[in-house]
From Swiss-Prot:
It comes from Murine adenovirus A serotype 1. GO terms for biological process: DNA-templated transcription; nuclear capsid assembly; regulation of DNA-templated transcription; viral DNA genome packaging via site-specific sequence recognition; viral release from host cell; viral transcription. Residues 1-10 have a biased composition (Basic residues). Residues 35-59 have a biased composition (Polar residues). Residues 437-449 are annotated as: DNA-binding. It comes from the Viruses. Homodimer. Part of a genome packaging complex composed of packaging proteins 1, 2 and 3; this complex specifically binds to the packaging sequence on the left end of viral genomic DNA and performs packaging of the viral genome. Interacts with protein 33K. This is Packaging protein 1.
Length: 449
């Protein structure tokens, strides 16, 4: 069972100009640390004061065109290029300074936006205009799903069931991450019952239990009108139930019709969330729990329609454990909708994961993503990078969760479009370079005769 509920989001009808300003503010999301502000200033817009949109002394000389075509190109020079050029420069500068950029083909580009406008040619300008429209359409469609600050308002946007894996070494803040996801309203709908599964109940310190109870209550409320607080679920205080792994895998808990099924009892009240922590050793044994990842959620929802949310979070310390006798971890990876990864994970495991899930992206964008992981592993603590297999929007397929700034889309789809534009510009310039070389050789031969 997989469904998407209605989005309780603010519809934001941003224009292209507003989106351009918003994107301009975010242009330095990932750049060379030695020159963080070198590309942040916008390129000055050329002054086109004549009626045709081009000054009389403009360096842009085009063949005679129909009025409609001429206006389109004038608009392109005045609007689209001013939007695209700083982003193209930023991406090219970033890629050229990547530690792993030795294998990348260097891309040729124009020196300035004026050179691009004057020398690109009609064909390239039309391609730039077409890709600009695709890019703006993508940004406009993502805007209603984001907060005014540009953050994601939910991890799953009512996608059900939510099966997620949290990868992180000891001390990376996995338990704090799970509490923050619940207390910051990033799980939709908010669970009314949370099952905390550990190998042994006595291994949970009292301070952690107090933190869980406090943040569950915090996540159950939101601001209402006239400085009031309103519960987000059908209960005033969500329940926290601790279970051992053996209790989780008890036979009666697989049968939704069994009167002792603890999950069925909770599903009668509302949404539930199951968190499996510190159980990687038990997951690798013979007993299968794969039903909790695919068959069990649909049966539970069919029998208890009031259970509108079913979330499972499984914590792993190793992205590729060797011991998986029952296939639990392999099945979990297949069924998982979200892979929440700490940049502190072993680099070779992170690289293997990225190579597996970015095959449709250009190699340069894959290297950029690896460098983002490497940068955050060395400079920032308690941040996370999330891969979503079923994103609400393509810009949210890869997301970045910062302790202070919240959950942000990484816009790798936009970076892919920009990189493809750089490749088109490079192709045109290299073709002209070959033509000039061939023409020079021909002239030399004629001169020698």
């Amino acid at each position: 069972m997989e469904s998407r509920g209605k989005h309780r989001l603010k519809k934001n009808g941003e224009s292209k100009e507003n989106l351009g300003e918003h994107e301009q503010a975010r242009i330095g999301f990932h750049r060379n640390g030695d020159s963080a502000d070198s590309l942040s200033s916008p390129v000055a817009e050329p002054n086109f004061s004549s009626p045709g949109g081009r000054s009389s002394n403009s360096i842009l000389h085009c063949p005679p065109q129909s009025p409609e075509q001429g206006n389109n190109l004038d608009c392109l020079v005045g609007e689209e290029l001013q939007f695209l050029w700083p982003r193209l420069q930023c991406l090219q500068h970033t890629l050229s300074n990547l530690p792993l950029s030795e294998g990348l083909k260097p891309l040729m580009n124009f020196e300035t936006v004026e050179d691009l406008a004057a020398l690109a040619g009609k064909g390239l300008l039309q391609e730039l205009k077409h890709d600009y429209e695709i890019l703006c359409k993508s940004l406009n469609s993502a805007a209603p799903l984001l907060s005014p600050e540009g953050n994601c308002e939910s991890l799953n946007y009512s996608l059900q069931p939510l099966i997620a894996i949290v990868y992180g070494p000891t001390g990376s803040g996995k338990s704090q991450l799970l509490r923050n996801l619940l207390s910051c309203h990033l799980i939709d709908p908010s669970p009314e019952t949370v099952f905390f599964v550990v190998p042994q109940i006595d291994m949970i310190p009292p301070q952690e239990m107090s933190a869980w109870n406090a943040q569950l209550v915090e996540g159950n409320y939101t601001c209402g009108p006239q400085q009031t607080i309103v519960p987000k679920s059908g209960t005033l205080k969500p329940r926290l139930i601790t279970l051992t792994y053996d209790d989780l895998t008890a036979d009666h808990n697989y049968d939704v019709t069994h009167p002792q099924n603890i999950f069925a009892q909770a599903a009668q009240r509302g949404p539930i969330c199951i968190i499996v922590d510190e159980c990687m050793e038990e997951l690798g044994k013979h007993k299968s729990i794969a039903k909790f990842f695919h068959a069990f959620p649909s049966k539970l929802h069919d029998r208890f329609p009031q259970c509108t949310g079913y979330s499972v979070f499984v914590v792993l310390h190793n992205m590729n454990p060797r011991k998986d006798q029952a296939g639990n971890i392999a099945t979990l990876k297949i069924q998982s909708k979200c892979h929440i990864i700490s940049p502190k994970m072993q680099p070779s495991q992170v690289a293997r994961f990225i190579n597996t899930y970015t095959k449709a992206m250009p190699t340069a964008i894959t290297l950029l993503l690896k460098d983002i992981f490497h940068h955050n592993a060395n400079h920032i603590n308690y941040d996370w990078i999330i891969y979503n297999t079923s994103p609400e929007h393509e810009c949210m397929q890869w997301m970045y969760l910062h302790p202070q700034n919240g959950l942000m889309p990484m816009y790798l789809n936009v970076q892919t479009i920009l990189y493809q534009l750089l490749e088109k510009i490079d192709k045109v310039l290299r073709q002209r370079q070959r033509w000039n070389t061939a023409y020079s050789k021909k002239c030399d031969k004629l001169a020698n005769k």
